Amino acid sequence: MEIKTDVVIVGTGVGGAFSALNLPEDKQILMITKSDLESSDSFLAQGGICVLRDEKDYDSYFEDTMRAGHYENRKESVDIMIRSSQEIIHDLIEYGVDFAKKDGNLAFTREGAHSRPRIL
């Protein structure tokens, strides 16, 4: 069997889906997964998505992420992840993701290695 496609995305979690959504609409995209959609890390994650709540949160978010990664994380990548988190959440809301809310505002929780509530 021969499959013709413009782009192959390995992974069907949030990262793979977000990558596909950000490609030009005229591209033929093939997404592959090692088993089924419910086995992706995104589907199995205990909570949600981390987001920088405000600039005062940056240092503790950075430290929490580095500590969770046993300080083996690439610092530049952690910085990009944190600084782009608000824009990505905005994009996900525009795509229709319905995050939990409390009193009309996003409801942040504290989970895992995070020292402050920053999980949606």
Predicted regions and their residues:
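A generic short-segment signal for beta-strand/edge and adjacent turn/coil regions
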Residues: 1, 17-21, 48, 90
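A short, basic/flexible loop-to-alpha-helix module at the beginning of a structural domain
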Residues: 1-4, 111
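N-terminal Rossmann-like FAD-binding beta1-loop-alpha1 element of flavoenzymes
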Residues: 5-31
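Conserved N-terminal/central alpha/beta ligand/cofactor-binding core
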Residues: 37-120
